[in-house]
Amino acid sequence: DVYKRQAVGEVNVTTKMKEVGAVIGGEGNGGVIYPASHYGRDALVGIALFLSHLAHEGKKVSELRASYPAYFMAKNRVDLTPETDVDAILAKVKELYKNEEINDIDGVKIDFPDKWVHLRKSNTEPIIRVYSEAATPEAAEEIGQQIMKVIEDLAK
């Protein structure tokens, strides 16, 4: 297994990278961490690695992009009340989807065969952020909305 998950945040990612001896790391926001340069997000290193890969492959950007599958992301949120026990809701969601692949390193991520949903509570306001990804924008939005409905029902 060459892919390791870690909680969001540069310090969390770099700590895990050092622990496992990773040669590259990053976050969903596009931040690239390349220890051969330094243990910090660096946009220029990301650009240099991309250009180096293009040169090595001898391809145009469009050709390289066409060689990868397309995924679409939807970002939503469920607004709750300050009295809501967000941790209890996330635990219930985890139980409801126990037959799917679940990762709870940073919230609750549910991996379905052809899509995923990641639920993260806010540390500053009573909300759950709902990130979803699928092969079409509609499918990403649909699975996000389905899980949001589950959360809203649990919060009643």
Language-model-detected regions and their locations in the chain:
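Short, small-residue-biased leader/transition segments that mark boundaries at the very start
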Residues: 2-3
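Predominant activation on well-ordered alpha-helical scaffold segments within soluble catalytic domains
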Residues: 14, 44-52, 91-94, 148
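C-terminal catalytic subdomain
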Residues: 20-72
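Catalytic-core signal marking the mid-to-C-terminal active-site face
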Residues: 57-156
